[in-house]
Amino acid sequence: MRSERPYSKISISSKAAKSLKNGHPWVYGNEILSSEGELVDGSIVDCFEGSSWQGAGFYNSGSKIAVRIISRNSNDVFDGRFWYRRILYAVKYRMTVMQGDDFKCCRIIHGEADQMPGFTCDRYGDIAVTQIACLGLEMNKDVIYKALRDVFDEIGEPLKGIYERNDLALRTKEGLELFKGWYGGADYPCITEITENGIKYSVDVENGQKTGFFLDQKYNRTAAARIAKDKNVLDCFTHTGSFGLNCAANGARHVTSVDISSQAVEMAKANAVRNNLEDRIDYVCEDVFELLTNMAAKKDHSYDYIILDPPAFTKSRDTVDSAGRGYKEINLKAMKLLPRGGYLATCSCSHFMTDELFRKMLSSAARDAAVSLRQIEARTQAPDHPILWNVPETDYLKFYIFQVV
């Protein structure tokens, strides 16, 4: 370790040190024992357990996560070259696991999984859409964005623009303002077109959910579509229509896609037209909970394949129980509506709804519906959203396909 480092020092508890040694990148405020030097929010600090250096990270006294570790190499200098190397490493990984159209439309930076805590970057062709939930990264974004552009210039796929989707509520916990817009004052259209699994989509980077599209379900859509041939499909929580479009393109007899958002339904309809699938998909703007309840009352068993892709019902441990009830309600109703031998694709995108809890919920719903679940596939997020085993927060998506028997 270099003897002279220009950073303030903090002493952390043995519990925090153990967590860092195990590879987790967070230090909580109540794990800081003492400090040496001025602690400036957004600055880099060195973390020590006694005299043993544990890593360097961004400090924020206003956040529950007081330090987000960005390096465990004491020789690192945090300049543009550092961020260039970090981003290049992430991009080369995506070039390995995502090829062709998949690389042109994927997550480039997945926060902690790419050693850039609190930073998300999704690519839609020549547009990058970013979200920052770390004060230190926000203060260094000019250097980071230049490095991002330089990396894509090097691989011969230059970026036209960077759109900042910094309207996520998590920023308020970091003391950051909410805003969205083109970085650097650029003025490009906020609607762009992508191709995924051979399906063309219009993506609204300004108003769409997340950064405009649910990239993490890329290969789950392919898996769901594989068994859709000749099926009558009910696609619930359709958003931009992706699951339904994949099913229709793969030979489904007919698809009904449902979403409570009229804006999402209109976007999904436009995507169907874009792919010449409008005659094979009906779109319904309705609350899925109410729709399933009404179908049950009418004893409507016309669908032999139901897809449930709900938004995250919980974003904290405090609401896991109520979220579990919501997940169970829609899955129980779907199981009761399906004929024996019908198919169910179901998922949860909440980290706090663990795989164990999700499986228990599904088992409980199956018991109440008096059915058995024959598992076809158990899946997770696409590899451009990598999971680090020592950072459980990076593991959040559960996706199952069953035959109901």
State where each predicted segment sits.
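Non-catalytic accessory regions of SAM-dependent methyltransferases
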Residues: 1-125
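Non-catalytic substrate-recognition/targeting regions of SAM-dependent transferases
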Residues: 109-122, 141-213
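Conserved SAM-binding loop of SAM-dependent methyltransferases across substrates and taxa
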Residues: 226, 240-253
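Conserved class I S-adenosyl-L-methionine
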Residues: 230-239
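Conserved SAM-binding motif I beta-strand of class I
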Residues: 254-259
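S-adenosyl-L-methionine
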Residues: 263-307
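C-terminal catalytic and target-recognition region of SAM-dependent MTase-like enzymes
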Residues: 302, 329, 343-405
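Mobile active-site "lid"/loop adjacent to the S-adenosyl-L-methionine
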Residues: 304-333
